[in-house]
Amino acid sequence: RGEAVLAWKLVVFSAAPLGDFLTLVGATSGKLLLQENRIAFDTGSALVYAPNPIQESGNLGLSDAGDAASNALDNARLAVTLLGLDPGIGTLKGEYVDLVGLAGGLAVPDADEVSRVYNYDRADDRFEQATIYHSIDSIQRYFHSLGFDDDTGAVNGIRDFPTLAHAHWNTADQSFYSTG
C-alpha cells in the first residue's frame, strides 16, 4: 500500500520445516504483514509424465505392460525442472515433498543423484519417484501462487511443509491419498 508501518521482525531458522523464515508482524495491529522462506533451495531436472502418457500422446492403446520401457511410453515423458530440492543431498526431498522420510513400503532404491538429473526410463523404479515429486511439488506451488496456504486454520491440503510420499508402498493400485 506504500505506507510505512511499525512492525516486529522475526527471523526463525528451522530444521522442520526446513527454512530461514522472515516474518513481519504489525506492531499495533498484530496482523501478519509478510512471511517468507528465504532459504536457497536447489533445482534439478527430470523426465516425467505430466500428467500421463495417454493424455500427452493421445494414444488410448497404451498399456502398462508391467512397467516395461517402450518407445511410445518413453516418448510421452516431458523434461521438467524440479524446484525446491533440499541443498546438499541428491535425493528427492524438498520444500513441499519428501520421498525419503516415510518408513515402510517396498524396498526399492531411492532416486539419489548428486548431479540433480533424474532421467530414468519407466522400467526404472526411480522414474515414479521423479514423477511423484514433480506432481506434488507443482500442485503445492500452484495453490500457493493463488494465495492459499496452511495458515487458514482449516485443513485444506495446502501445506507449508513437505508432504511425505512413497512411490512404491505396495504392489497394488496406488492412486490414492491418505491424510493419516
Pin down the residues of each PLM region.
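Zymogen propeptides/activation segments of proteases
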Residues: R1-G180
